[in-house]
């Protein structure tokens, strides 16, 4: 009985300490914006722009460094619009969520990854999304870093997760 009371007291104390946390980034990360919601919102917005064939809005969602590493990012966005002339629907929300947060020399960085399933014109696709939500040392890194897509028929584990040499920052249509 005493152990249970101590455990309840410790849980209450930890909850109070965390809820009174004065560090906005800690509060944001742990209480307001779970990575799954951020990934789902980002991907939903991207698919909305894709369905509207709004290349500029899609391009604006990528980190500036993705554009620097892939100077033809606008061409990749146009290729994606051409690849999906019909409406795209999200058939599976973010799964396989990963998040990394780090602080180096007082600089904070938070990245997230997730997998989605979409469908267009009767064809199903898997999508890998990598985003940066915070980088106080390099603001240009914030945004979509990589979006890789492959049809379910052509999928194998090494394509999206095995470091395919064809993948790069930006958009990768792996067909």
Short names for language-model regions:
Residues 22-25, 56-118:
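Short solvent-exposed beta->alpha transition segments
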Residues 99-175:
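Exposed beta-sheet edge and beta->alpha loop/turn motif
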Residues 13, 50, 135-137:
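Structural motif
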Residues 1-19:
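Sec-dependent bacterial lipoprotein signal peptides
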């Amino acid at each position: 009985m005493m152990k249970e009371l101590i455990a309840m007291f410790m849980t209450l104390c930890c909850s109070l300490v965390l809820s009174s946390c004065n560090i906005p980034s800690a509060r944001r990360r742990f209480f307001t914006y779970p990575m799954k919601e951020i990934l789902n919102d980002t991907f939903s917005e991207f698919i909305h722009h894709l369905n509207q064939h709004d290349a500029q809005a899609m391009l604006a969602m990528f980190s500036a460094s993705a554009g620097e590493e892939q100077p033809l990012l606008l061409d990749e966005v146009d290729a994606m619009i051409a690849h999906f002339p019909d409406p795209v629907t999200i058939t599976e929300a973010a799964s396989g969520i990963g998040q990394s947060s780090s602080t180096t020399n007082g600089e904070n960085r938070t990245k997230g990854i997730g997998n989605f399933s979409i469908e267009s014109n009767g064809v199903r696709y898997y999508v890998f999304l990598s985003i940066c939500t915070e980088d106080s040392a390099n603001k240009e890194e914030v945004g979509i870093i990589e979006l890789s897509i492959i049809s379910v028929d052509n999928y194998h584990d090494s394509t999206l997760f095995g470091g395919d040499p064809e993948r790069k920052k930006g958009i990768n249509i792996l067909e």
